[in-house]
C-alpha cells in the first residue's frame, strides 16, 4: 500500500501506470484466505454450560480470553470489508475499469500489464485525497489484523500448553 500511495502521489503518476494498476486491482479485493475458527467445540462448551464444569481457573480464563479475541478478529474482518468497499468507491473515480478488465483472465487473476497507452480517469485533488484516506484506512486495518492474529496465535499456543500441563496431554 505504501508503494502504491507513493506512486499515485508522485509529481508524475502517469510514469508509473504499469506498476500502479496491478496494485490498484489487488487492493480492492478481499483476501482469499482468512482465519476462520472451527469453533463447534467452543460453542458446545458455552451453550451446554459445560465450561463451568472446568475446575482449573487458568484454563477457563485462557479459553474465555481466546474466544473473546476470536470474536474480535471476526469483527475486524467486517471492518476490513467495509474499508475495501469504500476504497472501491474512491478508486472508481480515478482508475479505468476497462484497463482492469483487460489485465485479468477468466479466473480473475492479474495476468497482464496495462497497455502502454493506459491512463487514469481525470480526477481532482479532492478525489485523490479521498483515495489516499481509503488507502490509509486499509493500511491501518491490515496492521491491526496482523498484530491481532499474532496475539491470537500466541494465545492459542499458550492455551494448548495450559491444557497439556493441566490434563497431562501429549
Regions found by a protein language model. Give the residues of each.
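Long, hydrophobic alpha-helical segments that serve as membrane-spanning/inserting helices
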Residues: 1-170
